[in-house]
Design a protein with these regions (language model features):
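Membrane-embedded alpha-helical segments and adjacent helix-loop junctions characteristic
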Residues: 27, 34, 38-130, 272-277, ...
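Transmembrane alpha-helix interface/packing and boundary motifs in multi-pass membrane proteins
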Residues: 14-23, 99-109, 140-151, 236-242, ...
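Hydrophobic alpha-helical membrane segments of integral membrane proteins
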Residues: 27-32, 109-117, 136-137, 148-152, ...
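Hydrophobic transmembrane alpha-helices of multi-pass small-molecule transporters
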Residues: 1-60, 64, 177-302, 318, ...
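Generic hydrophobic alpha-helical scaffold/packing signal
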Residues: 145, 232, 236, 257-258, ...
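Alpha-helix N-cap/start motif
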Residues: 44, 90, 131, 172, ...
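Juxtamembrane and boundary regions of transmembrane helices in multi-pass small-molecule transporters
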Residues: 6, 91, 126-140, 145-158, ...
Length: 422
């Protein structure tokens, strides 16, 4: 049995186990991770590389930064201020998604989510609304916001690089031609019909970020300093390129500053790290690596694209590429999905004599639609435990958003980027 076939079998196993959740999600991820080593698909170093992935390091750091906001009561104070202005659940969803979406357009969507997750949990605690109904719109908005500018997500730059090789390019905000209507439609959906699809889970008793605490005895300087360090961490992420320090390291500096200044104790810092999230994300990265390294992902793409024939309609090609990227990105990283699909799409479009921009943008936008699984993007995984989400929760709330993104994209792309411009 080939390595690619074994990988696809592990993918099938993971999907089934994630859907029915007979065993915890993190345990399923570790079974896949270890299974890929035992079967010889991956070596130990590659299989476990996910646990030192930059996103995992960022998770750990931001769990501590978020933990400090809760331990000091600052998250609740911020929540009280926000709920004073946004009094209904609907207005909170609109406000959160709008702020996160716009921030994510110029910042890392993972970084944006990591900074704002503890704030939103504080808002939920103060307002009395279920955090599960606020966190999922937050991470979805972070993904949609990545399609507002050239630097919003790594996949955007991959397509830009491919276009550059044939003397074409996207403008800095050209992605927003499609991305902004999708963000607006997504916000409108979750503020209306989609509200009923958002999960409504109570906070678990063992939750590290419980808002039911007495903060009267916490020194005010700790509250102020926790907020100052959060703001400085956010500023560091905004100016990541200028200062030359990676997001995950900026997060680590913030976490260390909180511990060294005594804002949060080492014990509370360790308690705030959600190991279930770490095991889920780190373990499933091995599956993403296997899909990439064995060529299993490429096989799927080639089979689907090949089924279209030698001269497919550019409209059909764009739709199929979009949907294929949507499916793949929910199990592989969106960067890997885009990197895999962009050369294939560019080659086919050029062979047809069509302008490749619509197809490439379909590839990038589709590759960002990781809304249907908890492993589709790092931000999804970060809120699994805090929101008490299951695999089915993501599918129920996320699949309609994929449908909305598909319809919006298929209407706008051929108009904004004609296949055969005059």
């Amino acid at each position: 049995m080939s390595a690619a076939t074994i990988t696809l079998l592990f993918l099938l196993f993971a999907v089934v186990m994630f859907v029915f959740e007979k065993i915890p999600l993190g345990v399923t991820s570790m079974i896949v991770c270890i299974g890929l080593v035992v079967t010889g698909v991956l070596d130990v170093k590659t299989a476990f590389a996910g646990f030192i992935d930059s996103n995992v390091i960022l998770f750990v750091a931001m769990f501590i930064v978020g933990g400090a906001l809760f331990e000091t009561g600052m998250a609740n104070k911020i929540g009280g201020i926000v709920t004073h202005f946004a009094k209904s659940e609907r207005s909170l969803i609109v406000a959160i998604m709008s702020i996160v979406g716009l921030m994510s357009g110029v910042l890392s969507n993972t970084g944006t989510a990591a900074v704002l997750i503890p704030v939103v949990i504080g808002i939920a605690a103060k307002s009395g609304y279920a955090r599960s109904k606020l966190l999922m719109p937050l991470v979805f908005a972070a993904a949609m916001g990545g399609n507002l500018s050239l630097i919003g997500a790594p996949g955007n730059l991959i397509a830009q690089s491919a276009l550059g090789e044939i003397g074409m390019s996207f403008g800095f905000f050209e992605y927003a031609i499609v991305g902004l209507p999708i963000l607006a439609a997504g916000i409108l959906f979750y503020a209306t019909l989609g509200m009923k699809l958002l999960p409504n889970h109570p906070v678990s008793d063992d939750d590290a970020f419980s808002g039911e605490q007495d903060f009267n005895n916490v020194p005010k300087w700790k509250q102020v300093l926790s907020l100052v360090i959060l703001v400085l961490t956010l500023l560091g992420m905004i100016f990541e390129k200028q200062i030359g320090i990676k997001l995950n390291i900026i997060g680590c500096i913030g976490a260390l500053a909180l511990i060294l200044t005594g804002v949060i104790s080492e014990k509370d810092a360790l308690k705030s790290i959600d190991l279930k999230t770490i095991f889920l994300f780190g373990g499933t990265l091995s599956l993403a690596s296997a899909l990439d390294k064995t060529g299993a992902g490429a096989e799927i793409a080639n089979i689907v694209i090949g089924a279209l024939g030698e001269n497919p309609s550019p409209y059909v090609l764009t739709l199929v590429v979009f949907l294929l990227c949507c499916v793949m990105t929910n199990f592989m990283s969106n960067t890997a999905t885009t990197a895999l699909m962009v050369p294939i799409c560019l080659s086919i479009a050029q062979g047809m004599g069509a302008d490749p921009r619509a197809v490439l943008m379909a590839c990038v936008i589709g590759g960002s639609c990781a809304y249907a699984t908890p492993i589709g993007m790092p931000a999804n995984t970060m809120v699994v435990s805090a929101g008490g989400y299951s695999f089915k929760d993501y599918a129920k709330a996320g699949l309609p958003l994929i449908l909305i993104a598909t319809v919006v994209s298929m209407v706008i792309l051929p108009i904004a980027f004609p296949f055969f411009p005059q």
